[in-house]
A protein has these predicted regions:
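A cross-kingdom marker for long, charged
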Residues: 22-107, 111-368
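Positively charged n-region of N-terminal signal peptides that target proteins for export
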Residues: 1-6
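Bacterial N-terminal signal peptides
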Residues: 7-18
Length: 368
């Protein structure tokens, strides 16, 4: 039996955001991950982090590094620069080689699909910047400041673009000692906590504006799978199931977005155990769009944990059920919270949140 090996190649695109090609070598069935795979994945992430750090001068390292247990871990937001002040290493201040090293680190930390999602979100913000500089267009951003999220910056206008994303290390990258990789900007917050062979990428916020745009002749929808899979599920329910799933009130925004750590929502909607096996599969596929952003080695056991709570997992819906309409949905279980919330009835401006109420910031394995 021949194995399939995947190589991730990262290069800078014309816009300055790294592009990724996934090259398949060999053919046949992929072998299951070894028992050492999580530790090996952590080692690759740490190696990429160390390689980046070695490229920085003293000032750059000072911007990058924060205490592990300090206040920086909760300083993340969906808001753009000029409204929310981020700290860390700003992509726009880096050389091309340093920027490529940041994107190589993200490629190591994320799955191929997760990496593409992050790049597509960043490119979407570059679309906003270009439209801002030319006076707008279909993808202009009149409501970009909407949403909760931390301290404002000191005056100035709102700034979009793929330069406005920041990287921070909380603690020192290590294969044994807990540390955290934080990466974010407008409509993106990745909080990845690593402790040896354990990893948690919660809370995280992948969002999109514009939700659809054109890049190099192709249509890009950063959250298109999430949207389409959810509408497919709600329309696969029978009348009785829909009555249970659809909330009797409108949800206009994320309930547990930025700044809402430690809070909970009363479960609502239809229990996953009331779904047919095929409908359950559809729901898990939706959840995997968020859980599967991080490196696959860590995402697979995370999805197994989520599935194990079938009887206590709920799917809730608020809004129209025709695809192309602005509708909120939520998947919630003992170790899972996913929310998807179009902003101000716009299908072109989407916020989402992904949490584990038992393990945000890796609480289970770092003891904080």
């Amino acid at each position: 039996m021949r194995s399939v090996r995947i190589a991730i190649l990262v290069c800078l695109s014309a816009s300055g955001v790294a592009a990724m090609a996934v090259v398949q070598r060999g053919a046949g069935t992929t072998r299951p991950p070894s028992a050492n795979a999580p530790a090996e994945a952590t080692s690759r992430i740490v190696a990429a982090a160390v390689a980046l750090t070695a490229m920085l001068d003293e000032s750059g390292r000072a911007k990058l590094q924060f205490p592990f247990a300090g206040p920086q871990r909760t300083k993340w937001s969906n808001l753009p620069s000029g409204i929310f002040r981020r700290e860390g290493l700003r992509l726009g201040d880096l050389s091309a080689a340093q920027r490529s090293a940041v994107m190589n680190l993200l490629a190591a930390a994320l799955s191929p699909a997760g990496y593409r999602k992050v790049v597509d979100i960043m490119r979407g913000d570059e679309v906003l910047r270009r439209n801002q500089s030319t006076g707008g267009g279909r993808n202009a951003a009149p409501n970009a400041g909407r949403g909760r999220g931390g301290p404002a910056g000191p005056g100035g206008g709102v700034t979009f673009g793929d330069d406005e994303y920041y990287l921070a290390f909380l603690g020192t990258p290590s294969v044994t000692v807990p540390w955290m990789l934080q990466f974010g900007g407008h409509h993106l917050a990745i909080n990845l906590t690593l402790a040896g062979s354990q990893a948690a990428m919660v809370p995280s916020l992948p969002a999109a504006q514009p939700a659809t745009y054109t890049f190099e002749g192709r249509t890009v929808r950063p959250l298109g799978n999430e949207n389409d899979k959810a509408f497919a599920l709600i329309n696969a329910l029978d009348d009785t199931q829909r009555h249970q799933a659809i909330l009797g009130y409108r949800v206009a925004d994320l309930v547990l977005g930025p700044g809402q750590d430690g809070r909970t929502i009363q479960p609502e909607g239809i229990r996953a155990s009331a779904l047919s096996p095929s409908q359950q599969t559809m729901m898990w596929s939706i959840a995997e769009e968020w859980a599967g952003i991080m490196n696959t080695v860590f995402a697979e056991p995370r999805m197994a944990e989520i599935r194990s709570n079938l009887r206590d997992t709920y799917f809730a819906w608020s809004g129209p059920t025709t695809n192309g309409s602005p509708a909120y949905f939520r998947i919630q279980g003992p170790t899972l919270l996913i929310e998807y919330a179009p902003q101000q009835d716009s299908v072109d401006h989407i916020h989402t949140i992904y949490r584990d109420p038992t393990n945000d910031y890796g609480a289970k394995f770092v003891g904080k």
